[in-house]
Amino acid sequence: MKKIILLFALMFSVASFAQFKKVEKKESKFTEIGKVQPLGQPVQIVCKKTEDNIYAFSYRDNAYKTLDEYENFYVKDVDNAFDALYNTIIEGFETKPKEPIVLETENQFIYITFVQNFGTLVSLGSSDKNGSERKTHSATITKKQVEKLFGKNK
């Protein structure tokens, strides 16, 4: 009887170790272009690029002060769309539009909002094209931080 109990104990212990399987880390298909982390806070906005020239912007939704919810929008670099987005933002620092600039991608709208608060600041945001009422937006960043985000540091 003792041998049978010992046999069952060994079988269950082996079975419990067999439940886990080590997963090898895959290489990320994204290369980080730039990120904004103002005043030692958690990362606010990150720009990454794939081999397919798709730029992913991941930003902390500023609607929630206590929750860290991150949103994304993607820009395919067709006809220099990435540089056009950068130039649109930089031109906005000069023209200071009162209304948000709305850009349309394949499945999202990108909102670029400029605010005047101790200088000109910009906030990036997005919403789905599928009729979602929810618009998200990032924290406001400076022109220098935009240059860092887009990898245009001089």
Regions found by a protein language model. Name each.
Residues 1-22:
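Bacterial Sec-dependent N-terminal signal peptides
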Residues 18-154:
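Positively charged, low-complexity terminal tracts
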